[in-house]
């Protein structure tokens, strides 16, 4: 769904290991801070059009840290509280990095549409830069000719109808496995941790799309190790990097002293060894000719051999795009499915309404929902919309960076300013949504509001040039999975647990997920035919 989320960012206050580094580097950081603020004051005196700029309001800043201390473990919530005081366009300084946070639909429209071309580059964060093989993916590549070529390739090759059909096959195959597992659990009347089943499903879908049917077989000997390294990569990208907020020699030294650089290199090297093996296996002349044009790696290898445009495609491009696909798709789809099921377990009347729609549309005496049934379930799609409104997987959209001086809602924003869009705050803004904290899919009855980038009060996938390229595939995975969970089973909470007891506490960094597992009891739908 949403491509790679906010990198190395706001996942918490400054960790303990950095306190020693900051003390050791205090003199260097003080000098850097003085030089930076001196340059900022000089630029401010010159201003746009020869006058003083009208900068957005914001909280007072500490020396060195700027406003880093205000973020906390749930930055989207803290930033919403700050926006209530300072307004929907707010200026911060994160370390030495000038930053603007927008927290309303109108401000988001200015960033993502009106001034999209001014605000559509990406900051060169060191962690994502390394793991993307020097920004060779789509999610973190800076705006320019390279990014346009890559986006075109995505549209023509990776998101073509042939690829969509391959993804459909992967979904059907993995859903059969999930239903078989849940049938066994239902037969034993046991409670299950739904998280485990949902993550296995989404991992299987994306793995099959990327590497082919072998990913789900015992022949794929590297799967478990790859999953561990992938988890490490996602955790590392969400960790605090001093260089991300102090992009100078002092920040690099702090990362080196803390062990962050060594950890990043270890993860990168493990991923690289794995991807080299996968590419070599796909290029083996003895390998059978794949069906349906092959998997994602096959398509990318063919681009290496055949692409004659301005972009020279290499093995590093293959690795960067495959990693981008895994990081951007598995976690985001999984957390959306789990938040939807959590909300439905808290609202039994909504669960029954969605279930009745799915079962009426699909009919009785079927083993499960098929992909073509998705067009018949409009209310379930409202459930997905409402879930994404309340729980966007990336609460802060992937950061943008201004390419030139621009304005946002009348405020001057200099070039090279980092821009965050607080999608979580926008989805809960009472100016756009009555009873904004209530889960109520019926609010979309008769409404044309969607999440495809035209309605800025609902932007879990972003909008404009940088809208998530995998939106359609992610949306399909989520809707298809929820439809099957609701059709195939009745759901209950374990023991004497009541709907209001379902915890909605969240935690995370790259994506924000449930703090505790979702434990439920499935019962097989009595009118469903066995597979």
Swiss-Prot record:
Biological pathway = Secondary metabolite biosynthesis; dhurrin biosynthesis; dhurrin from L-tyrosine: step 2/3
- Cofactor(s) annotated in UniProt: heme b
GO MF terms listed in the record are:
4-hydroxyphenylacetaldehyde oxime monooxygenase activity; heme binding; hydroxyphenylacetonitrile 2-monooxygenase activity; iron ion binding
What membrane topology is given? Single-pass membrane protein
Known role:
Cytochrome P450 involved in the biosynthesis of the cyanogenic glucoside dhurrin. Catalyzes the conversion of p-hydroxyphenylacetaldoxime to p-hydroxymandelonitrile via three different and successive activities: isomerization of the (E) isomer to the (Z) isomer of p-hydroxyphenylacetaldoxime, followed by dehydration of the oxime to the corresponding nitrile, and C-hydroxylation of the nitrile to produce p-hydroxymandelonitrile.
Chief subcellular location equals: endoplasmic reticulum
Where, per UniProt, does this protein localize? Endoplasmic reticulum membrane
The reply to whether Cell wall biogenesis/degradation figures as a keyword in the UniProt entry is no
| Protein name listed in UniProt | 4-hydroxyphenylacetaldehyde oxime monooxygenase
Say which family it is in.
Belongs to the cytochrome P450 family.
Superkingdom of this protein's organism: Eukaryota
Q: Where are the transmembrane segments?
A: 18-38
Q: Which GO terms describe its cellular component?
A: endoplasmic reticulum membrane
Matching Pfam families = p450
Keywords per UniProt:
Endoplasmic reticulum, Heme, Iron, Membrane, Metal-binding, Monooxygenase, Oxidoreductase, Transmembrane, Transmembrane helix
Q: Per UniProt, where does heme b bind?
A: 122, 151, 466, 468
Q: What is its EC number?
A: 1.14.14.37
User: Which InterPro entries does the UniProt entry name for this protein?
Assistant: Cyt_P450, Cyt_P450_CS, Cyt_P450_E_grp-I, Cyt_P450_sf, Cytochrome_P450_71
* Catalytic activity of the protein: (E)-4-hydroxyphenylacetaldehyde oxime + reduced [NADPH--hemoprotein reductase] + O2 = (S)-4-hydroxymandelonitrile + oxidized [NADPH--hemoprotein reductase] + 2 H2O + H(+); (E)-4-hydroxyphenylacetaldehyde oxime = (Z)-(4-hydroxyphenyl)acetaldehyde oxime; (Z)-(4-hydroxyphenyl)acetaldehyde oxime = 4-hydroxyphenylacetonitrile + H2O; 4-hydroxyphenylacetonitrile + reduced [NADPH--hemoprotein reductase] + O2 = (S)-4-hydroxymandelonitrile + oxidized [NADPH--hemoprotein reductase] + H2O + H(+)
GO annotation, biological process: dhurrin biosynthetic process
